[in-house]
Amino acid sequence: MGISPILEAAYGVDGEANDRCEAGRSGHISGRRPLSLTRLQPTPRMTPVPGKRIDIRVSQPGAAGSDHEPTFPPYDGPALFSFGFRPFFLGAALFAGIAVPAWILIFAGTVGSNFLYAPREWHVHEMLFGFLPAIMTGFVLTAMPNWSGRTPLRGVPLATLWGLWLAGRLVVAMPGIGPVAAVVDASFLVALAAIVWREIAMASLWSRMPIGLLISLYAVANMVFHVLALRGAATDVAERVAISLILILLTLIGGRVTPAFTGEYLREHNIPSPPAVFSRLDRLSILFVVVAVLAWIAQPEARVVGVLFVVAGVTNIVRFSRWRGWTAWREPLVFILTVGYGWMALSLLALGGAVLGVLPAANAVHVLTSGAVGAMTLAIMTRASLGHTGRPRHADLMTVVIYGLVNVGALFRAFAPASGAPAGMANVLLAVAAIAWSGAYLLFAFAYGPILVRPSLED
């Protein structure tokens, strides 16, 4: 099978479709056409049919699919709550811009803290189970109408879900409310999983079950984190499960959109030698990641786990080198995907090095969470925000600065503290990393916030 059911769910395309085809333009919120995450992919168009796969066959670049698309009831509420990517991308960006500098101030002892959990647990929880789920939710809620053919979550239901996410951020920052805070926070991912499973059931999209399973596992990991933290126990296993799910998602989704958009760019600019199509090497690289993370969850200190991570890293480096992503450097909106996937492959090597005792574990984890997650999420957030609001898919100067900041922050956070600098200098380097990384998200909120709160240019 050329593509996993997870990606079929996210993009609504058959796994055997030509790997270089890109699912087409989707509609906007006025009721004329549906808005979907596949707006990220400019051509060809496709027709969502509830309960059925959309089988796209492309015989040559530029071939077009169907122009017939389902019509949704008109929406006349606030633009911010017209589609899931709007409130959740904006909320995640603002939260990252606040939470990361707050953590550095606490870590350096500049300010005190009085959170539900110890400062380190608060930071880990809010990045893994607060910030990332917001972006995940924006992604999924925008993709669902495409693969279900049903009206998207919008208006009051969407605002309620966003409010539940926000409530989770508030209660976890409060002391003394223990189980109540845990229930409030955990209910968000449970609600998201329920929404996804409802769409799967209502449209009989059983082939899309893996995406519901992954979100459900993420929700369970969050609940396990709360149970362990409330008991004063180590939360390592919940953290490893969450990080493992992130690695799998980045390998699958990044491994699909990166060559697709790179290939589109190369075709548009008549550059020969397109990215390699999905092959046995891609399957093996995904398999090695899955095997490595499963072993890591079970036996985090076993040397064989370190070897598995290194093998997974090497195969994924070979994998993404075949996509020729460097040839798209003139369009940062495309090139940032290659950078993000490169961070992901590097994080596998770093995790292997950590298990083998070569690198500090915190540095290895931040290669993934600061580098791969930072670059890939902002790549998706910027491209989706432009495409779904009727704007050209081109990175302006502000967007290039956003990409630069997040990568500079990731470099400082992932490697500088391991450079042997004195403690005082290490704190300075961490502060620089936090300012750059969180600054990228604040700049996204500043530059893209007006886009996200206003109607599409096509309305």
Where are these regions (language model features)?
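Hydrophobic alpha-helical transmembrane segments of multi-pass integral membrane proteins
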Residues: 6, 37-459
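Small-residue-biased low-complexity repeat regions
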Residues: 15, 24-27, 31
